[in-house]
Regions:
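Glycine-rich FAD pyrophosphate-binding loop
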Residues: 25-51
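Feature captures the FAD/FMN-dependent oxidoreductase FAD-binding
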Residues: 70-103, 146-152, 225-234, 239-249
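Conserved Rossmann-like nucleotide-cofactor binding loop
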Residues: 16, 41, 265
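Active-site/ligand-binding neighborhood in enzyme catalytic cores
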Residues: 114-240, 261
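Dinucleotide-binding Rossmann-like beta1-alpha1 core, especially the glycine-rich loop
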Residues: 52-130
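N-terminal Rossmann-like FAD-binding beta1-loop-alpha1 element of flavoenzymes
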Residues: 6-35
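Conserved flavin/dinucleotide-binding core of flavoenzymes
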Residues: 48, 102-103, 321-436
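Mid-domain catalytic core of redox enzymes
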Residues: 27, 236-352, 356-366, 400-402
Length: 436
């Protein structure tokens, strides 16, 4: 592309969209960039809300970490010295025990017999893996890699809870994204079996978080770089996209190029002339909604960051003490917690009921007592987690191929339909814009 005096549309202005605008302006300083965002409020899944002196990350628990040192340095640099560094204190709640995360590193806290059984299963499973094995689906990957004990106690119930689907209907593709799910290593297992603490999943064993303003500050820092140079149409959803000659028309705005950072099904629905097979492929892209329940507590937080909860009786799959991410997220002596609940697409959530169930779950786990609860809020994101169904790759490829032919480049979690953290999104957007 020879882009100097060119007009580019950015479709969707969450984390991927705001980064795309920034990289476009660096690459083509003369470009005119117009951004469409359906929400009046900017931030996407990196949104935070302040309620009575408590700050909640309303898109779920997000922290800054990466196994890519350059990406990590760039994202932390965005915060301009306003980033706090933490050593991860994450746990899996098993019965009354807090097992340090990753689970296979944390088993040293279990009684010796139980430890021996789970690690015995795991080693046996690893010894049986044939060379060149590829998992047929997520259930196959869990059972083959971790053995029946860890699968049954933790990974199956936890993953069924977050994905809300039978695990033999979820592809194992996403566990091949390096840095997405920790896989056990034998020396670590021997130490764990002997009851020696070890650290796993080193990429996020240290993480960063904004000093003030919640995780939204990460988004704001990227926004501040482009705000004066981009025409941001907040509260304007992408309703219509069509080709006119060699250009694209987005909601009646004519552009030379579009960078899509919005959910693919909504984008394809905006094209009146998309071929039927592309429309069908986009409709088959599955996802879960996420409801985030924020709870303000009149007590200090324990020395923990986030906790995975495989227990099927509890509605949320994870809760996080966001006031431990930054002390400015709660008044002194009090704490702010968020609990995350997924729902299949198309389900109309009853937020009042989910708030009540989340509080019940926290009481049941002994995380809080009724008298500690000051107030409870809930936020819904229709697009929470992209799902890796078994036909995910072919549907995604069909949609992306057709979009490229139309002159639309797709980026980010929702444009690429990948379960990416903010670091993977950063790298994807940067590389995509550099290749234009």
């Amino acid at each position: 592309l020879h882009l100097l005096a060119v007009r580019v549309a950015v479709l969707g202005f969450g984390w991927a969209g705001v980064l795309a605008a920034g990289f476009l302006l660096e690459r083509f300083p003369g470009a005119e960039v117009v951004a469409f965002e359906k929400s009046r409020r900017l931030g996407g899944l990196l949104s935070s809300a302040e309620v009575n002196g408590f700050t909640f990350d309303v898109g779920g628990s997000h922290v800054i970490f990466s196994n890519d040192k350059a990406v990590l340095a760039e994202v932390v640099a965005l915060l301009g010295g306003e980033a706090l560094e933490h050593r991860r204190r994450a746990y899996v709640r098993l019965g009354d025990l807090f097992v340090p995360y990753p689970f296979e590193n944390g088993l040293h806290v279990l009684p010796p017999e139980e430890r021996a059984e789970l690690i015995g299963d795991l080693v046996e499973a690893l010894m049986k893996i044939p060379p060149g094995w590829r998992p047929r689906h997520l259930l196959d990957w869990i059972e083959t890699t971790f053995g029946s004990g860890i699968a049954r106690r933790y990974l199956i119930p936890y993953n069924e809870k977050i994905w809300k689907r039978p695990l033999d209907q979820i592809s194992a593709d996403w566990v091949y994204i390096p840095g997405r799910l920790p896989v056990p290593d034998v020396k670590t297992l021997v130490k764990t079996a002997a009851g020696i603490p070890t650290v796993g999943y080193v990429e996020n064993s240290r993480f960063y978080y904004p000093r003030r303003g919640g995780i939204q500050r990460q988004y704001q820092a990227a926004l501040e770089r482009v705000r004066d140079k981009v025409a941001i149409r907040a509260g304007e959803a992408v309703k219509e996209v069509r080709r006119r000659g060699g250009r694209l028309v987005v909601n009646r705005v004519e552009v030379d190029l579009a960078v899509a950072a919005m959910p693919l099904p909504d984008l394809i629905a905006a094209f009146s002339d998309a071929p039927e097979e592309v429309v069908k492929a986009a409709e088959r892209l599955d996802y879960n909604q996420v409801v985030v329940v924020g709870v303000a507590l009149d007590r200090p937080a324990p020395d923990q960051h986030w906790i995975y909860v495989p227990d099927r009786r509890i509605v949320f799959h994870r809760y996080a003490w966001v006031s431990n991410y930054s002390p400015s997220n709660a008044p002194p002596g009090r704490s702010a917690l968020i609990a995350e609940i997924t729902l299949p697409r198309g389900v109309e959530p009853d937020l009042e009921r989910l708030k009540a169930e989340a509080v019940e779950g926290l009481l049941e786990l002994g995380v809080a007592q009724e008298r500690d609860v000051l107030h409870v809020e809930a936020w819904l994101h229709r697009y929470g987690y992209p799902l890796y169904t078994l036909d995910h790759a072919q549907n995604r490829d069909a949609v992306l191929r057709w979009l490229r032919e139309q002159g639309v480049v797709a980026v980010g979690r929702w444009g690429q339909w990948h379960y990416w953290n903010t670091d993977k999104v950063y790298k994807n957007v940067k590389e995509t814009i550099a290749a234009l």
